[in-house]
From Swiss-Prot:
This is Ribosomal RNA small subunit methyltransferase A. InterPro entries: KsgA/Erm (IPR001737), rRNA_Ade_diMease-like_C (IPR023165), rRNA_Ade_Mease_Trfase_CS (IPR020596), rRNA_Ade_methylase_Trfase_N (IPR020598), rRNA_adenine_dimethylase (IPR011530), SAM-dependent_MTases_sf (IPR029063). Its EC number is 2.1.1.182. It holds the Pfam family RrnaAD. The lineage of its organism: Bacteria, Pseudomonadati, Pseudomonadota, Betaproteobacteria, Burkholderiales. It comes from Paracidovorax citrulli (strain AAC00-1).
């Protein structure tokens, strides 16, 4: 029986074989590698991956799809909301110090998923995700551009990222109303040591009114923390490089 895509799960199933082949080439799975796929759906990407890996763990929220996937002898199915999955525990269960994570992420919750995975980055080898193109543009954006923001800073602090493949709407069933792309995310081997929650709070305050000078937002936040160091608040949030935000968070710790 044909599965009807569910809007509440943000389901858009990949159906273009040429795009699927290109994604698999970008991921380059090798036999025996511990890999987790988020949102396998109708297994368009799952099947070519598991053929190369031998075994694959998948996270699927849709009960009907999870039931279908369980009939595949080479898949280990976690039926769950991805935001509730402890990826560190998944890695431990696989006996792997690091896991590779891939997926066609639901566009309606892609940013929360990225922040959730940030909490488990210590067990991540790399990540390849299909996302809304405009989200990837924000992820890889440079300072002094309109796309540069909280997502750019938080993810660039922890990952090296690149946009590896453009995916048009007609590659999906049903077609989304937006362009898509695939991003590769590789954790930095030695990221600057900083408390993630502190950096996130600092960056959120900075970008809360991005058109204003930082003295009106971050300046007041720093005053409240009785910060005595030096930081140029005569700039707008989008003009401050990632390294400066990280250094400020370190100074505030």
């Amino acid at each position: 029986m044909k599965h009807i895509p569910r809007k509440r799960f943000g389901q858009h199933f990949l159906a273009d074989q040429a795009i699927i082949d290109a994604i698999v080439r970008a991921i380059a799975p090798a036999p025996g590698q511990p890999m987790v796929e988020i949102g396998p759906g109708l297994a368009a990407l799952t099947q070519p991956l598991v053929e190369r890996l031998g075994r694959l763990t998948v996270v699927e929220l849709d009960r009907d799809l999870a039931q279908r996937l369980r009939s595949h002898g080479q898949l280990d199915v976690i039926e769950s909301d991805v935001l509730k999955v402890d990826f560190s525990a998944v890695a431990a269960n696989l006996g792997a110090p690091r896991i590779r994570i891939v997926g066609n992420l639901p566009y309606n919750i892609s940013t929360p998923i990225l922040f959730h995975l940030l909490e488990h980055v210590g067990v991540v080898e790399d990540q390849h995700f299909m996302l809304q193109k405009e989200v990837i543009d924000r992820m890889v954006a440079q300072p002094a551009t309109s796309d540069y923001g909280r997502l750019s800073v938080m993810l660039q602090w922890r990952y090296a990222m690149e946009d590896v493949l453009f995916v048009p709407p007609e590659s999906f069933d049903p077609p989304p109303r937006v362009d898509s792309a695939v991003v590769r995310m590789v954790p930095h081997a030695a990221p600057a040591p900083v408390a993630p929650r502190l950096l996130e709070e600092l960056v959120q305050v900075a970008f809360s009114q991005r058109r204003k000078l930082l003295r009106h937002t971050l300046g007041r936040w720093l005053e409240a923390r009785q910060f005595t160091g030096t930081f140029d608040t005569q700039r707008r949030a989008e003009e401050v490089p990632v390294a400066d935000y990280v250094a400020l968070a370190q100074a505030c710790a």
